[in-house]
């Protein structure tokens, strides 16, 4: 089963996440099919906190990929951010 989830990057105590489409059996930070965005939870000032490729996410959800709970909330946040 294909899922849309977060893959952790960054340094110790400085997390940075890539939003990836991956096979659900793959390791958290392992092999992925496509990277569709990023999430920086500790962004400060003018740094970009969240970027998603909505068209690719819609495509993958249409093909049956299941987004994780956190990714669903990030998608909602991104759409809200786009409206402002």
UniProtKB/Swiss-Prot annotation:
GO cellular component terms, semicolon-separated: cytoplasm; small ribosomal subunit
Descriptive protein name: Small ribosomal subunit protein bS16
GO molecular function, one term: structural constituent of ribosome
Gene this protein is translated from: rpsP
Any one Gene Ontology BP term: translation
Pfam families xrefs: Ribosomal_S16
Species classification: Bacteria, Pseudomonadati, Pseudomonadota, Gammaproteobacteria, Methylococcales
Family: Belongs to the bacterial ribosomal protein bS16 family.
NCBIfam families given in the database record: S16
Superkingdom to which the source organism belongs: Bacteria
Keywords for this protein: Ribonucleoprotein, Ribosomal protein
